C-alpha cells in the first residue's frame, strides 16, 4: 500500500503494528480491521476506514484517478483478484513452510513450492503477451503483485529463469515510488535484484 501511496503522491502517516507482540488482536485495532490483519488505512479527509489490500488499492485508485482506467477495469480487476485470491495466499503459505519454518512439514514445503513455481509460470506466460499484468499500462494489479515477487529469493525458484516476469520485475523496480514505498517500513531494505 505504501507503493500506491507513493505512486499517487498522497501524504500519509504510518502507524506500525507489532505483529510479534500481537498488537493486531487488540480491541482498538479489531474495530478497524475485523480479521486482525494489516494493512488498514484511515482516510481522514473522507472519514473512511478501509481494510484488505485489494480494497485499499481500488479505493486509492478511485480517489486519485490513477492506475485504474475505467476502460480496462475488468482486466485490472481479474489480475488484482488473482493476486488477492491466489498469488498472495499461495506465496504466503510458501513463505511459512519454506522460509520461516523449513523442515517442519515436507508435504507443505513440496506443495507450496510446486504451486509457487506454477504461479511464476502463469505470470511469465501472461507477461509474454503484455507489458504489464492487465495490459500495456501499469495498474493496481501490478502494484498489488509486485511485493510478492520481490520476495523471490525466499521462493528459491529462480526469477531470472522467467524472462518476461524478470523484465516486468526490473521495469517496476526502477520506479521511484516503488523504490521509496518498498523500503518505507525499513529504510535499510532495498528491492532485491533478480
What are the residue ranges of the model-derived segments?
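Short secondary-structure boundary/hinge segments and terminal tails
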Residues: 22-23, 60, 170, 189-191
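Alpha-helix/helix-capping structural signal
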Residues: 55, 176-177
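GST-like domain detector, emphasizing the conserved glutathione-binding G-site
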Residues: 1-111, 124
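Short, solvent-exposed turn/loop segments enriched in Gly/Ser/Thr/Pro and often Arg
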Residues: 18, 140, 185-188
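GST-like fold's C-terminal all-alpha helical module
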Residues: 86-176
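Active-site-flanking alpha-helical
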Residues: 61, 148-149, 182
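Phosphate-coordinating loops and pocket residues in cytosolic domains that bind phosphorylated ligands
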Residues: 31, 174, 183-184
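Terminal-tail/helix-coil boundary detector
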Residues: 179-194
Amino acid at each position: 500500500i505504501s507503493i500506491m501511496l507513493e505512486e499517487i503522491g498522497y501524504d500519509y502517516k504510518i502507524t506500525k503494528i507489532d505483529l510479534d507482540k500481537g498488537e493486531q488482536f487488540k480491541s482498538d485495532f479489531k474495530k478497524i480491521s475485523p480479521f486482525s490483519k494489516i494493512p488498514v488505512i484511515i482516510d481522514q479527509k473522507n472519514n473512511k476506514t478501509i481494510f484488505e489490500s485489494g480494497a485499499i488499492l481500488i479505493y486509492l485508485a478511485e480517489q486519485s484517478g490513477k492506475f485504474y482506467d475505467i476502460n480496462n477495469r475488468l482486466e485490472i480487476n481479474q489480475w488484482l483478484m488473482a493476486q488477492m485470491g491466489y498469488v498472495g495466499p499461495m506465496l504466503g503459505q510458501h513463505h511459512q513452510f519454506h522460509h520461516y519454518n523449513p523442515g517442519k512439514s515436507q508435504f507443505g514445503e513440496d506443495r507450496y513450492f510446486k504451486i509457487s513455481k506454477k504461479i511464476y509460470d502463469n505470470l511469465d506466460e501472461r507477461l509474454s503477451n503484455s507489458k504489464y499484468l492487465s495490459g500495456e499500462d501499469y495498474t493496481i494489479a501490478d502494484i498489488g503483485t509486485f511485493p510478492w515477487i520481490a520476495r523471490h529469493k525466499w521462493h528459491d525458484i529462480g526469477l531470472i529463469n522467467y524472462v518476461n516476469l524478470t523484465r516486468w520485475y526490473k521495469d517496476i523496480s526502477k520506479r521511484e515510488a516503488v523504490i521509496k514505498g518498498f523500503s518505507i517500513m525499513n529504510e535499510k531494505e532495498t528491492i532485491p535484484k533478480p
